[in-house]
């Protein structure tokens, strides 16, 4: 991994590492850069954690990885960052002639990424003709570079894992592949235990919840605030709870103040279990996602997901109107008024919330840690 920061990818890595260790696997985690303290503290002391000499190709990194592979007799490497070529380049050199299998995982929609989205937003915002042309050229350069990088990673991996079957065609096209026989489909597991949770609709509060990074490029939380601004006056007994932090928090707080919203609460980074147990609705309005781990985690606690359909994997998870609500993707942009109407339907209808919440719990069981780890073990056996 490049980093081991506070994020879904890192949490999934931690949960899988702990479970694999309990099953007797010899697990080691390696990061190019130092980990976030909060994430490192989540790991048991019996799981070795190594930090390399920064994210670059160097003899020192190659030697460090080679020593780790030999010391711990590693047979399989899971590359949790399946986009950049550099980790695979360093790993291949470190492996030498050792028969070590590589499984690369891409944790997002393979048809886009943060760099491309930034340029797309810039294209929308600039007025000058030549500025748009230059930005479009920049976009195509990024697009080609990303595709070539993913192509390299795929070629030198024994398996390339995507989170949804719906991503296969876009991945094949994006990475300039003629075949995709090494692609493996496996979603992420629910990382927060909910087996002891007993659903009681009467214990659910009138709370709408967001859990995750406060990040504008991907998460677009301002959409939730805009929707809430149209709801708050009509639902004074409801609250919007935002659990998470990030670079855009100050701007988001400023927006809440500007709109004079009274029932919006910022909780910062917290263990979301308590919030899942009591919340009624989860909103996720990202511009792109890979899987949206918070969706299935919330569902396991009977929280109804209302999710913007900007990524195809959400249709694998949610049956619209049965165990959650999907807000259809709109090429012209997120439809705040439509989202508001859908939220009103839920907030006004307790019976509907009760039914959808119970159905969501049933759906979430497909993504249990036990089920996903079992699939991983079957993959290991085939390598």
Q: What is the predicted function of each stretch?
A:
Residues 139-182:
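A short, active-site helix/loop in glycosyltransferases that binds the activated sugar's phosphate group
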Residues 287:
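Aromatic "clamp/platform" in nucleotide-sugar-dependent glycosyltransferases that forms part
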Residues 10-15, 206, 215-230, 247-253:
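A conserved mid-protein helix/loop that constitutes part of the nucleotide-sugar donor-binding site
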Residues 48, 251-269:
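Nucleotide-activated donor-binding/catalytic signature segment of Leloir-type glycosyltransferases, i.e.
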Residues 2-7, 13, 18-56, 167-170, ...:
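N-terminal strand-loop element at the rim of the active site
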Residues 304-308, 318:
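Short hydrophobic beta-strand element within catalytic cores of glycosyltransferases
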Residues 79-86, 106-109:
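Short His-centered aromatic/hydrophobic patch
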